[in-house]
Structures are given as C-alpha cells and as structure tokens.
C-alpha cells in the first residue's frame, strides 16, 4: 500500500463520538481519555490491513485533515443547540452540544487545507500521533505473533513545513515505538518519513 490514509477510520458511528469528545476536551487528561477509546479500534483496523498485505510494504499516514471535517457544520450545530435550548432537553446534554458548537466556531478557517491540519494538528494535539503510533505498532506486533508475518512498515508524518516540525513529530513516534517494543519484548524495523508537500518547504530544501 503506497499510502494508507487513516482519517477514514475515524468516521465510523462508533468513533465519531470519541472524536467529538477529544476535540471538546479542555485538558490533556480529558483528551487522552478520549483518544484511548479510539486506540483499540485503530489497532483492529491496522491488524486487518497488515494481515491482508501478508508482509508487503504498507505506508501509514498519520492523521492529516483539519479537525473541522469530523465536526458538524456551523449552521447544523447552531440550529441543533437552538432547538435544544427551546425545548426541555437535558441541560447536561445541551451543555455538551454548546461546547461542541464552541469548538466548531473556534476551528472554522477560511482555507482549512492550509490551516490546522497535518503536522500542525499533531503539534497542537500530540495525543493523536501518540495514540496512532501505538495502535500501528501494537497491530504489527500482534500480526507477527499471530501470523508469523513481519510487517514491512513505514509511517508517514503529514504536511510538514519545517525540519523542526518533522524532528518533533518523529521523536513522538520513536518514543512510542520504543515503549511498545520494550513492553512487548520484541521489535520490528519501522521506517519513519514524510511527504514534502508545501511549496515553501520544497523551495527551502531545494536551495539548501
């Protein structure tokens, strides 16, 4: 697989509530609780991919799109909150939807494709690449244990603009892999890299 895009794994009906919980979390602890709910689901997905590939190369791209793609539209969520405020809806549930609306407004961007996505998203929410790295390597080790098949694994850090961004995210992934290898008592080779997409970074590298 030249590029296994992980964002589609988050759109399932059993995953979106956890994504909303993560997005509206007010503390790192709350955010980690939410992503921990997603981790076993991601691991199961990756185990399926790795099993099907039978040792062929798989490049997994960490979460790339902006968070607003996982949220309802501003109009949709505004109408939902208004309706709840006009009816006798449970106040706790109403407050939860208000918090979601606040995040929809906060994450709204004029050009989200060049905004808070890819590596920038990972810098703001390091719990996401941490969770994904653990899910990926746990899945690879599980397939090795169960099938005796070593995964030819490559992890891509998305939409990098600067060397510092790449180094920061690479360290997060490497630290997670080291912890998981120690926990499992075995290891596999993993290649970590990026696709240099932004024109600015490409221009800078070309003139180094």
Regions inferred by a protein language model and the residue ranges of each:
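A short, basic/aromatic helix-end/turn motif that makes direct DNA contacts
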Residues: 208
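Conserved alpha/beta-domain cores
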Residues: 1-205
